[in-house]
Amino acid sequence: MIRTMLQGKLHRVKVTHADLHYEGSCAIDQDFLDAAGILENEAIDIWNVTNGKRFSTYAIAAERGSRIISVNGAAAHCASVGDIVIIASFVTMPDEEARTWRPNVAYFEGDNEMKRTAKAIPVQVA
């Protein structure tokens, strides 16, 4: 059996730009891409915490250290500057590998300040 697993996640980054007329994609600070293990041109899902919209696009690199999250093209209708979003990528793998897989997660606060990284998502408690 093949399973689709979370590969990497940027948790609660803030949109810094939204450019309707750029040709598409989401530009992401290269440091952030590295932290989540997301590659340039990789498919990503974006979940907008602020407005509830969910959409897919692909990642492109923004300048390292810039803290840029720029939602571009038609996707700019789904996010505005200042919105808080979660950006995720996924990977497929055999069931036996999936059972021990741990995703790359980066957590953010404020103006895209990376607070920590982890190889797991905490267990949710009531």
Curated annotation (Swiss-Prot):
Q: In which pathway does it act?
A: Cofactor biosynthesis; (R)-pantothenate biosynthesis; beta-alanine from L-aspartate: step 1/1
Instruction: List the active-site residues.
Output: 25 (schiff-base intermediate with substrate), 58 (proton donor)
Manner of cofactor binding, per the entry note: Binds 1 pyruvoyl group covalently per subunit.
Cofactor(s) listed in the protein's UniProt record: pyruvate
Query: Which cysteine residues pair off into disulfide bonds?
Result: none
Coarse class of the protein's main subcellular location: cytoplasm
The reactions it catalyses are: L-aspartate + H(+) = beta-alanine + CO2
What are the EC numbers?
4.1.1.11
Q: Which GO terms describe its biological process?
A: alanine biosynthetic process; pantothenate biosynthetic process; protein autoprocessing
**Pyruvic acid (Ser) occurs at which residues?**
25
Entry PTM? Is synthesized initially as an inactive proenzyme, which is activated by self-cleavage at a specific serine bond to produce a beta-subunit with a hydroxyl group at its C-terminus and an alpha-subunit with a pyruvoyl group at its N-terminus.
Q: State the similarity comment.
A: Belongs to the PanD family.
Q: What does this protein do?
A: Catalyzes the pyruvoyl-dependent decarboxylation of aspartate to produce beta-alanine.
User: Assembly state and interactors?
Assistant: Heterooctamer of four alpha and four beta subunits. Interacts with PanZ.
Indicate what this protein is called per its UniProt record: Aspartate 1-decarboxylase
The gene coding this protein = panD
